[in-house]
């Protein structure tokens, strides 16, 4: 498993977790801006929780969210800035039958508006049925 984050602080926490749970033989951590520093390989599954909060919602976030770095939350005007980059690059990193699982929080309307050509499978969670989506490599390949 390759785990990626652009934040050195987030990777420090991840390193502690890897050590605490004895996962060093199964998990490699990479400081990278999305796919930029990943090894050249293809993955069966890519799971991503990018910053997706739109600029209008950023200013209205409850106080407890303000303890999180803005880098971890802010997704640009419509919340889809990094999602666009992920969807564009993911096919190069997904195996032929690979899938992308992407969390977008409460931004489904923005996702649908930004990507009307896509028909993801919306995955149910305990919290909701429209915050986590699955797309195949085939769906992402023009």
PLM regions: where:
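Flexible, glycine-/basic-rich loop-and-beta segments that form/coincide
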Residues: 139-142
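Mobile active-site "lid"/loop adjacent to the S-adenosyl-L-methionine
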Residues: 51-81
């Amino acid at each position: 498993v390759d785990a990626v984050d652009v934040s050195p602080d987030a990777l420090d926490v991840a390193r502690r977790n890897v050590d605490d749970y004895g996962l060093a033989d199964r998990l490699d951590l990479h400081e990278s801006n999305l796919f930029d520093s990943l090894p050249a390989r293809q993955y069966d599954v890519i799971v991503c929780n990018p910053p997706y909060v739109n600029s209008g919602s950023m200013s209205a976030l409850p106080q407890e969210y303000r303890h999180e770095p803005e880098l971890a939350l802010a997704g640009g005007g419509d919340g889809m800035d990094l999602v666009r980059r992920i969807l564009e690059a993911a096919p190069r990193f997904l195996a032929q039958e690979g899938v992308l699982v992407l969390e977008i929080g409460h931004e489904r309307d923005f996702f649908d508006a930004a990507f009307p050509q896509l028909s993801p499978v919306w995955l149910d969670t305990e919290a909701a049925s429209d915050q986590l989506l699955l797309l195949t490599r085939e769906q992402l390949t023009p």
